[in-house]
Amino acid sequence: MEELIAIVGPTAVGKTELAVAWARRINGEIVSADSRQIYRWMDIGTAKPSPEEQAQAPHHLIDIRDPDQPFSLAEFCDLATAAIADIRGRGRIPLLVGGTGQYLAAFLEGWQVPRVAPQPDLRAELELIAAREGPAVLHARLAAVDPVAASRIPPTNVRRVVRALEVYLVSGEPISRLQERKEPPFRPRTIWLHRPRAELYARADARIERMIAAGLVEEVAGLLARGYDWSLPAMSSLGYIQFRPYFTGEADLPTCIERLRFDTHAFIRRQEMWFRRLPNLEIWTPDHPSWREITA
């Protein structure tokens, strides 16, 4: 069974720098495990690898959907599997790189991801219940039919609650049963890039400043001008939804930027909760000999 190297870590930890340098050393190619870098025209806010970085090492699963096109966990697993097979078939080495915890867990742990297609009308109906009656009411419905899933999904995560109910109502099977795992066809070697929390926050704040200077607000305006509205999952992404009050006239720009900082710090904490559960973890800090050698 072949080894699969996965480089994981929270936003702003330094994944791209390490991954590109490592790929260049080992004749490798990068398979992105980022649920937002799949979208075209969303470059700055998603911290997408630059054209220069992508030129140094081939990247897969980046810029594969428009912001109004759906993309599921099952599609990610299928496309990542195909990309890894293609890379290996050409005698090169795949590196799975990203920070989307659910994508990483599903792929590395061998989840059997439900193949239930999105049902827009049903989703809208369930979302309306959450909006009118509160997320707790919707979560209680999930608990009644799939208590295992309900124990794993907080009531505040309306999107995942809706998806779990959607799967049950369409397939008749609880999503928790459909997500039972089997051994993946590779040996995962999961490298968690780790920095102290205060350092991560400072790096994230500095990156936000660079994003603003690079034209993040203009990027959001461009997406709106293309007709992509705030109801789309892509537009709810970190780095985009925080600017909605600015464009609707409800808040000034500094307030929205401060909200982005706050939400990014919270996102880092959630990411780290996912990483702790991944298989075969190696924790690398910046003074780890391999990290230093690869990026030297």
Curated annotation (Swiss-Prot):
ATP-binding listed as a keyword: yes
InterPro entries: Dimethylallyltransferase, IPT, P-loop_NTPase
Pfam families named in the record: IPPT
Record bears the keyword Nucleotide-binding: yes
Marked site (Interaction with substrate tRNA) residue numbers: T100, R123
Enzyme class: transferase
Cofactor: Mg(2+)
Entry keyword set: ATP-binding, Magnesium, Nucleotide-binding, Transferase, tRNA processing
Catalytic activity: adenosine(37) in tRNA + dimethylallyl diphosphate = N(6)-dimethylallyladenosine(37) in tRNA + diphosphate
GO BP field: tRNA modification
Binding site for ATP: G9, P10, T11, A12, V13, G14, K15, T16
Record: residues binding substrate: T11, A12, V13, G14, K15, T16
Chain segments carrying region Interaction with substrate tRNA: 34-37
Entry EC no(s): 2.5.1.75
Any one GO molecular function term: ATP binding
Top-rank taxon, per record: Bacteria
Annotated SUPFAM superfamilies: P-loop containing nucleoside triphosphate hydrolases
Similarity comment text for this entry: Belongs to the IPP transferase family.
Protein function: Catalyzes the transfer of a dimethylallyl group onto the adenine at position 37 in tRNAs that read codons beginning with uridine, leading to the formation of N6-(dimethylallyl)adenosine (i(6)A).
NCBIfam families listed in its UniProt record: miaA (TIGR00174)
Description of how the protein assembles with itself and partners: Monomer.
Protein name: tRNA dimethylallyltransferase
Encoding gene per record: miaA
